[in-house]
A protein has these predicted regions:
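Alpha-helical residues within the helix-turn-helix
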Residues: 11, 23, 53
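A short, Lys/Arg-rich alpha-helix, primarily the initiator
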Residues: 1-20
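Residues in the helix-turn-helix
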Residues: 31, 42, 61
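Residue-level signal for the short linker/turn that defines the boundary of a DNA-recognition helix
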Residues: 15-17, 43-46
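DNA major-groove recognition helix of helix-turn-helix/homeodomain DNA-binding modules
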Residues: 46-61
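Short, charged recognition helix plus adjacent turn
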Residues: 34-35, 63-72
């Protein structure tokens, strides 16, 4: 499964709303909401770039792959 760390990154930077993050990054609110709650099925490179630039992080800090032990 893919896990989003957006909530953690927002907390570290004291960003309290997706609306504020949207204004700061130029990423749409609905796209951020899908990443935040884990319902996103794809993320555009431009979205990843904007978020990594804003949070000064690597892709692996934003999202991570966690193997599902039940699928082995």
């Amino acid at each position: 499964m893919i896990k989003s760390n957006l909530a953690m990154l927002m907390a570290e930077k004291k960003i309290r709303s997706l609306n504020k993050l949207s204004k700061e990054t130029g990423v749409s609110g609905p796209a951020l909401a899908r990443i935040y709650d884990g319902t996103n099925v794809r993320i555009d490179y431009s979205t990843i770039e904007a978020l990594c630039r804003f949070f000064d992080c690597k892709i692996g800090d934003l999202i991570e792959y966690i193997p599902d032990p039940e699928q082995d």
